Amino acid sequence: MFEIELKAHVRNRENLIAELKTFATYEKTVERNDFYYGKEIESENSTLKNISVRLRKESKKTEQGTEIKNIFTYKQKEIKQTASKIETELNDEKECTVSDFAPIEEFLKDSGFILTLHKKKSVEGYILNTGFGTANIEVCNVPPLGDFIEIEILSKTKDEKTVKNIQNELVKILQRCKIPESDIESKYYSEMLREAQEVALR
C-alpha cells in the first residue's frame, strides 16, 4: 500500500480539535517513540545514497483499552506536487511488529547502521470516510517543533490520476479543518528536527 499524506502546521490546537469533532470520528490517542537508523550505501549507478529504517515503540489508547507495539519500518519517500503546487508525501511503507527490538538493534549496528535521530510524537487520531477510502487524521505534537496535522489516505496504486485525486481530497479535508494552504509543510520531520538541533547548537 502507498501512503499519500499532507502535513501542515497547527496554530491553534483547541480550535482544530473542535472543528474536527464536527465531521470526523475520534479513534485513538497514541504516544510514539521513534528511533531512526541510517547507513550510506552505493547505488546501482555508483552514487552514494542514504537508507534508513525506523524502530517505533507505540502506546495506543482506544475505547477498548491500551495496546503497546514495537514496529519495524522501512519506507521509501517521494514528494509529489498538485496542479496548484501544493506538496504532499507519497510513501511506499513496509513494516512489521516485533516482540523485542534488541536483536534488530544489534544487527543494525553490526551492519554499519548508526542511530541518526530520535523523535517523540503525541497523537490524537480521527478517521473520516471519503470516496477514496478512510482518511486518517492525526493532530500531532512533535517536540520541539510544535503542533501539526497529518492527513493520510492509503492507495493500492500510485498512478498519476489516483495520486492527484487523493491529493485533492487531502486539500479539501484541510480546508474543512479551516487551516490555510500556506501552513502546509513539505519538509520531513527528520529535516526539521535536524535544523532545530543546528539552531540550538549555535
Where are these regions (language model features)?
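N-terminal strand-loop-strand beta-hairpin
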Residues: 1-132, 188-202
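Intrinsically disordered, low-complexity acidic/polar segments
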Residues: 15, 62-64, 148, 158-161
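Conserved, surface-exposed functional patches that form binding/active-site neighborhoods
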Residues: 111-160
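Mixed-charge, glycine-accented linear interaction segment located at domain edges/termini
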Residues: 158-187
